[in-house]
Amino acid sequence: MYVSRLLFHTIPGKTGEVEKELKKLRDMVMTAGGNHARVLHTHFASLGAADAVFEQEAPDLQTLEQQIHQLTNSQEFQSWSYRMSSLLTQSPKREVYIINE
């Protein structure tokens, strides 16, 4: 099992808007077949840490890649991405972890 995280660094004062947009992303991911998608808000972190995190689980990398491909090719995602870019100080970074239980 894998968990994918997208880290978002927001423009000051825009974290609330980013979280609303990430909830829209969550809905799009679920439509694309994603599981356990959720939005995390940074409560306390070291300097330079992301302000918001989008997280989703996938059983394997192939499934994750298929979901990402399906999502990013949609017009809805393209419009969403354009809106999001004005709320961020930098492009989001993706991290993929193996869940080791």
Q: Model-found features: residue ranges?
A:
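Short, low-order "capping/linker" segments at domain edges
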Residues: 95-101
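Short, well-ordered beta-strand segments in beta-rich or mixed alpha/beta enzyme
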Residues: 2-9, 38-72
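Short, surface-exposed ligand-recognition loops at beta-strand->loop->(often short) alpha-helix junctions
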Residues: 9-20
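Intrinsically disordered, low-complexity segments enriched in polar/charged residues with Gly/Pro
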Residues: 14-15, 42-44, 83-84
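An amphipathic, aromatic/His-enriched active-site/gating alpha helix that lines ligand/cofactor pockets
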Residues: 20-38, 57-94
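Residues that cap or initiate secondary-structure elements
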Residues: 12-14, 60-62, 100
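Absolute protein N-terminus
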Residues: 1-2, 101
